[in-house]
């Protein structure tokens, strides 16, 4: 069940990046606009759910939900910067190396045992990503750097999610993730908040909606992992 939900999450995250790139191909869009709309829309959904179910807004572990929110915001911001400066393929392939960083951090943070063969899988994963990306070391693309940094921070964000899931419900984690993300990115889009007109605007909203769905699936999915 958990694996299936994570697959759905990556499906929606991938479509979010495609829509973001399509919007940028029509008109230059501030990368933080995609991030802000994702978090603001998600905040609205999480708030409505908590109010309708009359659930408490108070988490048991403030430190974990705040860590999850801050790390995820940084990761998503870096990811959309990557999309702006490199191809969708490179951005997604680099970002999808985040499980390797989860693998590295988990034994130290969550005290999970790692089998020795896992390190070989880690090496193959990193080499495979490098082959697909085909980096030019004489002229490093800044977008690729953002993509790799996004994966690193995302790995830490997933580890914090694993810890938070031990104490909090999925909705509480999502609520604070979206709230923190909205607050941290608002300053980058206001007072010049503009959604592009026409088709580009629809792509921007589609990217935000797919991002929210991906965030929901990945948060719930790790409940079963």
What are these regions (language model features)?
Residues 10-14, 18, 40, 47, ...:
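Hydrophobic/small/kink-forming positions within alpha-helical transmembrane segments
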Residues 81-89, 134-142, 166, 191-198:
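Membrane-interface helix caps and helix-loop-helix hairpins in membrane proteins
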Residues 2-9, 54-78, 142-150, 195-213, ...:
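Loop-to-transmembrane-helix transition segments
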Residues 25-33, 78-95, 168-171, 218-225:
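Structural motif at transmembrane-helix junctions in multi-pass transporters
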Residues 1-32, 138-163, 206-209, 213:
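Glycine-/small-residue-enriched transmembrane alpha-helix faces in small-molecule transporters
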Residues 117-133, 154:
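Hydrophobic transmembrane alpha-helices of multi-pass small-molecule transport proteins
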Residues 79-81, 98-120, 192:
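C-terminal transmembrane-helix exit sites in multi-pass transporters
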Residues 27-74, 153-157, 176-192:
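Transmembrane alpha-helices of multi-pass small-molecule transport proteins
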